[in-house]
């Protein structure tokens, strides 16, 4: 006897369930944002650290991806394919706690005094001078960062330090209300936020801003649109964002930057500019600059591995073949 379709199986019901789930998620984010700003910081810190430890013990899919990435860091740094399991687990726990601190600070950033952001930020003087010298001269600057430390706090610092504002790109989160909340949050810090998808191509707008002598900040250690550049990082092939294409297109200064946590404070290193090669095709220049960028990221991550919050696959060997360009897929 055939089973009659249940109302719960209908497409209409599925769509309703999806919309309800998104609304509840959006409500939870907005409520959490308001509550965390009101809870005493030590209590909030304890709650976020505890949540990180629970996730670490459960060792779900995201934690497994994080550990796979960190395994490559340890293996390369130790020059050995054999990684001590206890060392890896200890590092992944520290990384999840660092990631939890990032989110706690994101939620609380609107109530952190500017004076605290300025006094707690430790930046190498030479890099800081180079960044603002370029901007003062009217030359556009691209800051390219890995997912390390608290780059949102670093953004608040660079605005307060005198950059005025900068432009960045954000992935569209679901539900839309959460994405809009993050856009408003970043705009409140002095950022112009462009959507990665669902709007005009961000590349053209970013190029306009750079030609106007503005600052652009992009997290660049992951290929978000499957149009990135293949590089070697930690002895493995990986795909990172083609941020270097903006420098080739506009002549803007490409400055790698790494951020990390220093006790209760924050550290940042602004590296020397990666120049556009004098010879080669446009594509060859982008690849060469991207490889240099990957080398800087590699060194920064190796120095502060617990502050690399990479819970997504970046290494070619770990990627789903369906996500690779046709030129990278194995022949049948």
Segment roles from a protein language model:
Residues 36-38, 150-156, 176, 205-219:
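Short, composition-biased local secondary-structure segments
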Residues 27, 62, 123, 198, ...:
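Soluble or luminal CAZymes and related metallo-dependent hydrolases
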Residues 126, 169-171, 196, 271-273, ...:
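Conserved beta-strand termini and adjacent loop/short-helix elements that scaffold enzyme active sites
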Residues 2-5, 12, 16-20, 80-84, ...:
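Non-catalytic C-terminal accessory region of glycerolipid acyltransferases
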Residues 128-132, 155-159, 182-183, 206-207, ...:
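Short amphipathic alpha-helical segments and helix-helix/interface helices
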Residues 121-124, 148, 175, 196-200, ...:
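A conditional alpha-helix N-cap/helix-loop micro-motif detector
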Residues 109, 137-198, 226-229, 262:
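Catalytic core of membrane glycerolipid acyltransferases/transacylases, capturing the structured
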Residues 2-142, 190:
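Membrane-anchoring hydrophobic helices of lipid-metabolizing enzymes
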């Amino acid at each position: 006897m055939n089973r009659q379709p249940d109302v719960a199986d209908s497409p209409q019901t599925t769509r309703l369930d999806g919309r309800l789930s998104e609304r509840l998620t959006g409500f939870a984010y907005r409520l959490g944002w308001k509550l965390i700003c009101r809870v005493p910081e030590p209590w909030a810190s304890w709650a976020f650290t505890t949540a990180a430890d629970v996730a670490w013990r459960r060792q779900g899919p995201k934690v497994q991806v994080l550990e796979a990435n960190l395994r490559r860091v340890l293996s390369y740094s130790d020059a050995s394919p054999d990684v001590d399991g206890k060392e890896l687990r200890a590092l992944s726990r520290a990384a999840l706690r660092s990631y939890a601190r990032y989110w706690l600070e994101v939620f609380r950033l609107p109530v952190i005094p500017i004076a605290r952001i300025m006094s707690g930020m430790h930046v190498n003087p030479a890099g800081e001078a180079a960044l603002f010298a370029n901007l003062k001269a009217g030359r556009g600057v691209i800051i390219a960062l890995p997912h390390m430390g608290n780059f949102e706090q670093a953004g608040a610092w660079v605005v307060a330090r005198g950059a005025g504002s900068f432009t960045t790109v954000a992935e569209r989160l679901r539900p839309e209300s959460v994405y809009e909340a993050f856009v408003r949050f970043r705009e409140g810090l002095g950022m112009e936020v462009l959507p990665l998808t669902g709007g005009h191509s961000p590349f053209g707008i970013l190029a306009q801003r750079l030609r106007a002598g503005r600052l652009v900040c992009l997290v660049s250690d992951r290929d978000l649109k499957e149009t990135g550049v293949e590089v070697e990082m930690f002895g493995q092939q990986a795909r990172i964002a083609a941020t270097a294409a903006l420098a080739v297109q506009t002549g803007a200064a490409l400055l790698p930057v790494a951020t990390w946590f220093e006790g209760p404070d924050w550290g940042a290193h602004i590296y020397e500019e990666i120049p556009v090669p004098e010879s080669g095709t446009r594509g060859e220049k982008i690849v060469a600059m991207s490889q240099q960028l990957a080398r800087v990221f590699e060194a920064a991550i190796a120095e502060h591995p617990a502050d690399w919050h990479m819970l997504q696959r970046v290494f070619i060997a770990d990627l789903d073949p369906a996500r690779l360009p046709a030129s990278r897929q194995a022949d049948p």
